[in-house]
Amino acid sequence: MREFFKKYDFLVLPVSQVAPFSIDQEYPAEINGIKMNTYIDWQKSAYHISAMGNPAISVPAGFTSDHLPVGVQIVGRHRDDFGILQLAYAFEQKTQFAQRRPPICSK
């Protein structure tokens, strides 16, 4: 991470590796052909960032074609909490995703 942040100010990535899934499903059994053995396995994109100790924030980023919410995670350099808050605010102001609501429907 240190090498990455020598060149870049932020890392922006999906909050999770999959879209929201059915409440009846404990966790995705497979993602892109890779078996998920535990509940934590499917959350690796968020889990590894948290373990690094870098400041991170999640912000709304729209909806899937099924109208389920998705988000992006903004990660900053060590101790740059204010920087990620500024970028998150700018993203929300520009996209207005936080103001959007999906149509209420059931499939």
Task: Place the predicted regions along the sequence by residue.
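Serine-dependent amide/ester hydrolase catalytic core
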Residues: M1-A51, P102-S106
